[in-house]
Amino acid sequence: MPSDHPDFRSKSARLRCQPPRTNNCGTFKQPPSVAATSRPKPGNPFLQPPTKGTPPPKKKKKNHTEGCHTHEANPEPNTKHTETEPPIISHCPPPHPGPTATPNLLPCPNPTSSFCQNTRDSPSLPPNVQTWSIFPKHPSKDVTAQVKSQSVSHRAPITYQPPRPTTTSNPRISQSYHMKSISSYLSFAHMNITHTTEQHAENQPHWKTILDIAPFVSITFPAIMCLIFDEDSFEESPFLRFITLLLPFSYSAVQYALLYTNWKSHNKPEPILHTTLYYTLSLLLLAFTIISILSIIPFSLNEWDHAASFFYPIVLPSFTVPPAYLLSSSYFLVPRQIRLTDTVISILISVCSIVNVLLVFKEFNYYPYSAIISSISVLLQLLSEKHCLFKQSPPSTASSRAAVLILTLILAVLVYTFLGYGAIYILDDHFHLLGKMKSILPSEPHQ
């Protein structure tokens, strides 16, 4: 048998002639130790190159995974050579787990990489078949996860399919979402309500202060205007007369209107006596409101002489303001429960109003005293409400307190009857209303 027969060649020569093995990473080169021992040496017939009859090894095409080198030694035992061969050293990444994947396994972000593809050319290794289960990141109770299985061969790469978006059909998720939105809205609404309440609480003392000083200002302001301007100024300027009378008449109109609405808001009494008192007081309050509004224009149009320049700014406010102030602050006007609820200073104000009526029939030199008395009595009333200077009256309806209430109502009726008559007289003097009404009405034929 010739020496160049394949059976007589060395182990290294046979390894050099055999085609290289491939694994998951493609073609691999022999280690330098094996390559060094496989070089032919002169004079050694066993290390000669193969004969011409032996076909050379075919070169395989480089795979995209070339670069991952695995040094593999001869798996068969070498009885002729005593040199040790190195173990298998793999630089490739570990293979991807197969069917034993974890439940929440996410697919490979780059399907074309060497880590995701598993191409095998060796027939000794079976093709790796992987089954991926795709689950949503946020699973819901009602919506089940869809499981997708794909068979991966050594030729076809894995195609990545993203998971479908989950819906909010879960009642717990939707309920929590709505509860969050409602809580945020309620927090904003609570903030808005708190801000409104705090603003109302801050503005309420200011309005209360304005309403408390309104009767005092309504009496003193026209008196100050009378002291500042002379008789000629009031006679020449109707606007100045209007400004002087606007504040006291407006205060009385507003107070009587509020009393009328509060009185009408209560239930109507059933007995005949209470029903009569109920409608009588309602009619009086409504008449006082209308007369206070309509009296501003006629008294402003009238020409003020020397006596009128003291009467309108000083006497009229002391007539109109105290009754309205007493009825709105000192009396509890409720059907079946009408009583005096304030201090004894209310009686003093009623007495001062009667004194003012008596002073009207005297000379105009006493006019300033009526304004001074009314202003002082109202000021004492305001101080008693704020600092409790006088002892409050009991809630029971005594005969004396009922008499004071009746006296106040009679005084108001007399004052506003006088104001109504004066307003009609002034309008008739300017526009001759009575003459026009007589001409319109049919006259009786003369016999």
Swiss-Prot record:
Region of interest called Disordered, as start-end residue ranges on this chain: 1-103, 147-173
Coiled coil: none
Pro residues compositional bias, start-end: 92-103
InterPro entries, sorted: UPF0328
Source domain of life: Eukaryota
Biased composition (Basic and acidic residues): 1-10, 64-84
Pfam families, per the entry: DUF2463
Family to which this protein belongs: Belongs to the UPF0328 family.
Name under which the protein is recorded: UPF0328 protein ECU10_1870
UniProt lineage: Eukaryota, Fungi, Fungi incertae sedis, Microsporidia, Unikaryonidae
